[in-house]
C-alpha cells in the first residue's frame, strides 16, 4: 500500500519541499489498496447531480440530493444492509468509497455550488482537509452538505455526511480508522393531488409550481447513521521475488487482516397533519385505513450491525502452488 512522501530536494544549503498528494481506497473487504489519481481536470464539472454522477440512467425525484435509484440492472446493488438507505447511496457511503491520503504538505479542498432562484434554491458544500503527522501517519476530515427546496411543495432535502479518518502505512503494519456520521432529512409530499394540474395547467390559476396542492405538507423521513470502521494489516515473513533485469524485491509471505465495522442506523417517519386531512365521510384519503392514531404518526426503526472479520491473505508470488 502507499508509503510516505519523498524527502525534500537540496539546492546548495536550501531544502525545497516537494508538494505531493497521494490517495487510495481499500477494496476486496479491505485486503487490497487501489491508488486513485488526484483529478485536476475539469472533465465532468457540469454534472452536479449526485444521481448522474453515480449512474447515467436513473430514476429520481428531481431536486438535487433527493432519493434516486439506478435504472440499469447492472448498477443495482447485489446486497443490502439497511433497506431504507438504498435510495440514498450518495449520503450513506461504503468503506470501498472512502479515500485515504498521504501528502507532504497539508491538503485542503473546498467545493461550493448554488443554483436559484432563492425560493427554490439548491446548495452543495464540500470540505476536505488532510495532513500528515509524519511520513507514514495521516489524519483528516471531510464534510459534505446538500440542501434543496424542490420544485413543488414539501420536497425539501437536507443531507449531511461528516467523516474523520486516519491512516498509518508502515512497511510491516498498516491501520485505517474512520468515524462517519450521516443524515438524510427529507420532506415527502406523496405527489400532487391531481395530475391534471400538470397535464392541463391552463385550466388552473396556480401561477407557480409551488402553489400546486400536494398530498402531504409535513410528512418527513429522517435517517441517521453512525459508523465506526477500523481495518488493520500485519505482514508476515519476507521473500525475494525476481523482477527480471531490475533485480529482486522483498515481498511478504502472507498478510493477516482484521476489520471491525460497527454500523448503527435509525429511521423516523412522521406525519403531523393527519387530523386536518382525515375525513371518514369523504373516503378519498391517501391511506385507505388508519389503525392507530388519526392525529399523527411517528414510526421509528433501529438497525445495528457489528462485523468483526479476520482474513489471511497469501502472496501468490511467494508460493508457486497459489499461482
Language-model features: locations:
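Acidic, small-polar-rich N-terminal luminal/periplasmic segments of exported/outer-membrane proteins
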Residues: 4-104
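Primarily recognizes Gram-negative and organellar outer-membrane beta-barrels
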Residues: 3-9, 94-104, 108-135, 142, ...
Amino acid at each position: 500500500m502507499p508509503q510516505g512522501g519523498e524527502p525534500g530536494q537540496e539546492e546548495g544549503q536550501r531544502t525545497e519541499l516537494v508538494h505531493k498528494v497521494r490517495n487510495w481506497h481499500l477494496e476486496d473487504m479491505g485486503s487490497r489498496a487501489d491508488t486513485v489519481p488526484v483529478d485536476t481536470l475539469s472533465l465532468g464539472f457540469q454534472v452536479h447531480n449526485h444521481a448522474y454522477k453515480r449512474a447515467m440512467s436513473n430514476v429520481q425525484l428531481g431536486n438535487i440530493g433527493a432519493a434516486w435509484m439506478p435504472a440499469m440492472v447492472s448498477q443495482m446493488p447485489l446486497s443490502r444492509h439497511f433497506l431504507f438507505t438504498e435510495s440514498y447511496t450518495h449520503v450513506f457511503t461504503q468503506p470501498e468509497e472512502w479515500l485515504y491520503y498521504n501528502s507532504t504538505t497539508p491538503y485542503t479542498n473546498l467545493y461550493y455550488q448554488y443554483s436559484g432562484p432563492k425560493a427554490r434554491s439548491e446548495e452543495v458544500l464540500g470540505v476536505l482537509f488532510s495532513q500528515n503527522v509524519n511520513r507514514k501517519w495521516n489524519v483528516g476530515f471531510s464534510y459534505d452538505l446538500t440542501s434543496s427546496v424542490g420544485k413543488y411543495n414539501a420536497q425539501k432535502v437536507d443531507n449531511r455526511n461528516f467523516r474523520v479518518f486516519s491512516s498509518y502505512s508502515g512497511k510491516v503494519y498498516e491501520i485505517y480508522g474512520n468515524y462517519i456520521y450521516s443524515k438524510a432529512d427529507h420532506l415527502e409530499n406523496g405527489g400532487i393531488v391531481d395530475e391534471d394540474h400538470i397535464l392541463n395547467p391552463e385550466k388552473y390559476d396556480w401561477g407557480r409550481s409551488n402553489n400546486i396542492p400536494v398530498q402531504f405538507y409535513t410528512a418527513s423521513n429522517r435517517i441517521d447513521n453512525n459508523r465506526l470502521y477500523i481495518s488493520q494489516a500485519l505482514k508476515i515473513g519476507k521473500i525475494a521475488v525476481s523482477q527480471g533485469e531490475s533485480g529482486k524485491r522483498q515481498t511478504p509471505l502472507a498478510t493477516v487482516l482484521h476489520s471491525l465495522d460497527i454500523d448503527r442506523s435509525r429511521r423516523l417517519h412522521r406525519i403531523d397533519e393527519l387530523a386536518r386531512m382525515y375525513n371518514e365521510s369523504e373516503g378519498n384519503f391517501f391511506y385507505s385505513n388508519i389503525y392507530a392514531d388519526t392525529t399523527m404518526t411517528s414510526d421509528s426503526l433501529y438497525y445495528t450491525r457489528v462485523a468483526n472479520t479476520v482474513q489471511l491473505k497469501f502472496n501468490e508470488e511467494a508460493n508457486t502452488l497459489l499461482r
